[in-house]
């Protein structure tokens, strides 16, 4: 009998180390992968000076970006434009979703100085719009909601003109407590991603629940009817287009007015494989359907991610 696997606190488990402890049957690192179509090619910038500057600034303040931790394909574009999505509460997630490249493990306690350091970094970068997200922190009584509120408060204290979007986890089992924590320091945009369709949740989002996520979006909107709510979906995990359209209908039924829809890309051979590549024309059709359903803003395209050009989307610009 083998020795039971024991995670060490503060250690990042990624790729094979992460997915080896997930009971997912269709991860085969030796399987033949789908060939990327021509529209999935990324053009890298000629200079990395701006990218290095942002990375060094974050390292200097001990901060993290989801752009790096989740291996976002748009990192070079966004960093070159001087924008980044900050990831609070550390870089180790208590969940182990097999599509995600963020490390899994036992996280360290939250840094009480992080809200202040974050606010100062944003001030140094002279940002007008910022997106704050986090790992899942199922180890915390409020699931990290109080830390979100502290960050919003500190950011606004130093940057009174800024617009703040928060991309939150599902606050599993603590929705009411989480919303109470956010009550006095709400964001300008509240974002929570459904990620994909309910039929695939057990496989792709272990520990999550489709109805919980809808409840979170619905109850935030009931508490703050004037604040836009937003959600994002990935395609290419085994769903079909009609199932995605049904999720979009569910979002509208629960008051969500902003949508992002992008192509899933496999971070490594130890993650869930891409089941299909959706064409740009299909993304255009999704955007048209979203408008018909009443979404005020819908960013739909192969490289669209939840915080991709979030400032442009919030102002009503076309993102694809």
Swiss-Prot record:
Top-level EC class: transferase
Biological or metabolic pathway of the protein: Protein modification; protein lipoylation via endogenous pathway; protein N(6)-(lipoyl)lysine from octanoyl-[acyl-carrier-protein]: step 2/2
Signal peptide residues on this chain, from the entry's feature table: none
Cofactor note: Binds 2 [4Fe-4S] clusters per subunit. One cluster is coordinated with 3 cysteines and an exchangeable S-adenosyl-L-methionine.
Location(s), subcellular: Cytoplasm
Annotated GO CC locations: cytoplasm
Keyword set, alphabetical order: 4Fe-4S, Cytoplasm, Iron, Iron-sulfur, Metal-binding, S-adenosyl-L-methionine, Transferase
Iron-sulfur as UniProt keyword: yes
Positions that bind [4Fe-4S] cluster 2: 93, 97, 100
Recorded catalytic activity of this chain's protein: [[Fe-S] cluster scaffold protein carrying a second [4Fe-4S](2+) cluster] + N(6)-octanoyl-L-lysyl-[protein] + 2 oxidized [2Fe-2S]-[ferredoxin] + 2 S-adenosyl-L-methionine + 4 H(+) = [[Fe-S] cluster scaffold protein] + N(6)-[(R)-dihydrolipoyl]-L-lysyl-[protein] + 4 Fe(3+) + 2 hydrogen sulfide + 2 5'-deoxyadenosine + 2 L-methionine + 2 reduced [2Fe-2S]-[ferredoxin]
Pfam families documented for this protein: Radical_SAM (PF04055)
Binding site for [4Fe-4S] cluster 1: 67, 72, 78, 307
PANTHER family, per database record: LIPOYL SYNTHASE, LIPOYL SYNTHASE, MITOCHONDRIAL
Similarity-based family: Belongs to the radical SAM superfamily. Lipoyl synthase family.
Protein name (record): Lipoyl synthase
Species, as recorded: Actinobacillus succinogenes (strain ATCC 55618 / DSM 22257 / CCUG 43843 / 130Z)
